[in-house]
Structure formats: structure tokens, C-alpha cells
């Protein structure tokens, strides 16, 4: 299984639009895109990348530019987009999101940003992430604390760092919780099947 995390830029400034692909089980980086591309062109690019990697979970920060990309991906009918519950930021699948009014994309807020960055620092420090990109490595080296806020040094970029941090956060929170819920449901269903079989044989 794979996840693709994207950070969307306008395509005409100093920031880049980026997409990172990680193996969910090992958190090994397997692919990377970084370029100055307009949001309307980035959406089909992301569709192709996520489809190529086994219909990967596609995580896009739902800022002003990200919302447009998310809308376009929904028009393209990509069916494995990251959704969350607006009030709690809790991950839900697309079907559940439609029922409970979930929000497409990942919300990076004043509340979630420090948690996301801290999770990335934990993954890097404990070697829980395998980075195969010199560009990402260089961004990490210039990602510093400034006025109480972790960010890129002046004239440097942090697009890949932020996308990687979101990947680590989603992998270690939303996907782990979701996996446990699936295992719990499976155990319950297995128990029901076993009980039914026992009753039928008596």
C-alpha cells in the first residue's frame, strides 16, 4: 500500500508544488515530484501518480489552492482521497465522509501544524522514515525554528518537508487507528460467523 501527499503552490512564485509517495508499511520514499505547475494541471498529474501506485491514498492540504485541486480530483472521480471530520480532524473514508459531512483533504491549522512537525521530527530522529531524496534532505537541513515557529530559512523552501510531515502524521495516526478499527470489525464478524456455524451444527 502507498500514500501520496501533495502540497499545492500557485506555480508562478518561489514555492513549488510537490508530491511524495511513501510505502505505508516501511515509510520508504519511493517517488517524488517537484515543479512549478499550475493547480489545474497538477490535479491530473496527481491522479496519474496515485493511480500508478495502486490507487494510493491521496492526501492534499486543503488550503485555498488545495481545495481547487481536490475539487478537480473529485470531478476526475479519483476514489481514494483523504477526508476528515471538520471538528476533530479525524480521518474517515470517502463514503463515511459523504454521510457525516466530512471535509476533503488535510487541514493544516495552528492546532495541527506543531503536532505534524513534531511527528516528522520523531520519525526522522528514530529512523522510522527512509528518505531517498537529496532535495528533501537539503530542505530538512534548512528547516529551523524562527520566532517560535518551525519553518524554512529565508530564501529556502520547505514544501517537501511539510508534505513528508503530513505523510508521517497520517501514517502514524489516521491509518493506524483505521487499521485497528478494521481488525476489530473483522474479529467481531469472525466471532459472529463462528457462533452461527456452531448453532447450525447442533
Give the predicted meaning of each segment.
Residues 1-88, 92-95, 110, 114-118, ...:
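RNase H-like, metal-dependent nuclease domains and their acidic two-metal-ion catalytic environment used
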Residues 95-102:
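Surface-exposed intrinsically disordered loops and tails
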Residues 104-110:
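Amphipathic alpha-helical blocks and their helix-capping loop/short-beta junctions
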Amino acid at each position: 500500500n502507498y500514500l501520496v501527499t501533495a502540497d499545492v503552490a500557485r506555480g508562478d512564485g518561489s514555492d513549488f508544488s510537490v508530491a511524495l509517495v511513501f510505502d505505508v508499511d516501511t515509510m520508504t520514499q519511493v517517488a517524488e515530484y517537484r515543479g512549478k505547475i499550475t493547480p489545474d494541471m497538477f490535479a491530473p498529474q496527481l491522479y496519474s501518480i496515485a493511480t500508478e501506485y495502486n490507487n494510493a491514498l491521496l492526501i492534499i492540504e486543503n488550503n485555498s489552492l488545495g481545495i481547487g485541486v481536490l475539487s478537480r480530483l473529485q470531478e476526475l472521480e479519483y476514489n481514494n482521497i483523504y477526508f476528515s471530520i471538520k471538528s476533530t480532524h479525524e480521518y474517515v473514508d470517502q463514503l463515511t465522509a459523504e454521510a457525516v459531512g466530512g471535509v476533503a483533504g488535510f487541514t493544516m491549522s495552528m492546532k495541527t501544524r506543531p503536532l505534524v512537525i513534531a511527528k516528522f521530527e520523531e520519525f526522522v530522529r528514530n529512523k522510522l522514515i527512509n528518505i531517498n531524496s537529496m532535495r528533501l534532505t537539503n530542505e530538512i537541513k534548512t528547516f529551523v525554528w524562527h520566532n517560535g515557529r518551525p519553518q524554512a530559512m529565508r530564501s529556502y523552501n520547505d514544501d517537501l518537508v511539510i508534505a513528508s510531515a503530513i505523510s508521517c502524521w497520517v501514517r502514524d495516526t489516521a491509518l493506524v487507528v483505521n487499521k485497528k478499527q478494521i481488525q476489530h470489525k473483522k474479529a467481531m464478524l469472525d466471532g459472529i460467523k463462528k457462533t452461527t456455524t456452531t448453532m447450525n451444527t447442533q
